[in-house]
Curated annotation (Swiss-Prot):
Membrane topology designation: Lipid-anchor; GPI-anchor
Organism (species): Trypanosoma brucei rhodesiense
Name of the protein this chain belongs to: Variant surface glycoprotein ETAT 1.2
Job description of the protein: VSG forms a coat on the surface of the parasite. The trypanosome evades the immune response of the host by expressing a series of antigenically distinct VSGs from an estimated 1000 VSG genes.
Localisation per UniProt entry: Cell membrane
Alphabetized SUPFAM superfamilies for the sequence: Variant surface glycoprotein MITAT 1.2, VSG 221, C-terminal domain
Keywords tagged on the record: Cell membrane, Glycoprotein, GPI-anchor, Lipoprotein, Membrane, Trypanosomiasis
Residues excised as propeptide: 39-55
One GO location term (cellular component): plasma membrane
């Protein structure tokens, strides 16, 4: 489609001389993602909260 403005080449894929919208990739977590830091933070804060509530 010609909208009268210059196409942004980051948003489109040129095919047959026309700018077609790119299909966005969904961010899927891979098995290499390191979540150890986030999990240990949750464990430390929950333990601290439990100690404060009990004493």
């Amino acid at each position: 489609k010609n909208t009268g403005r210059r196409p942004n080449y980051r948003e489109c894929e040129m095919r047959d001389g026309e700018c077609n919208a790119k299909v966005a990739k969904t961010a899927e977590p891979d098995s290499k993602t390191n979540t150890t830091g986030n999990n240990s933070f949750a464990i430390k804060t929950s333990t601290l909260l439990l100690a404060v509530l009990l004493f």
